[in-house]
Amino acid sequence: MGVTLFKEVSYTLSKLIDSIEMGEIGLPEIQRPFVWPNTKVRDLFDSMYRGFPVGYLLFWANGSGGGHRQIGTGTKQRVPQLLIVDGQQRLTSLFAVFKGIPVVREDFRAERIRIAFCPLTGRFEVTDAAILRDPEFIPDISEIWSEQSNIFELADAYIERLRRARPVTPQEQKAIQKAINSLDNLSSYPFTALEIASSATEEEVADV
């Protein structure tokens, strides 16, 4: 066996989000635009909420300082140290929903992905007109992780909205608060990344 060209690194989701926001993680030019349908984004959050694994990430240490794109449309603060080789769709989905920002589709159209959550059933849905009218759902989970949000106030506001539609039992109130707290805790969801050394060539990385 030759020299090992990768190492295994553990991340929390919040660390990944912060690294993308700071520009430490970017997209190499060989990657695709965002192509996932919103239902796949919904399913990703559902799997994470239920505690299932959602796959490894594959990063490539950026030795050149060029040939990359970054997630989102804002100006990043630094040259990416890591380029995403596998996991672009998952990380773009998570970053867009956590930060409440639009993704750029293949036709260069900006789209905000809105995912709804029902605390009493643990169900996720793509937000539509019917979901917006349904008091059982939080219509946009992005607000959970907004810097302006308070998780306790958000839970209270949801319960109050539900009470205007029907009675809420004390047991339901506890279940709602627990579910919203569990959703908030997705920021600590664990990911494992394999980081390929910068000495690997683009051809070698493409063959992985």
Task: State each model region's role.
Residues 2-208:
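Basic- and aromatic-enriched surface patches that contact anionic nucleotides/nucleic acids
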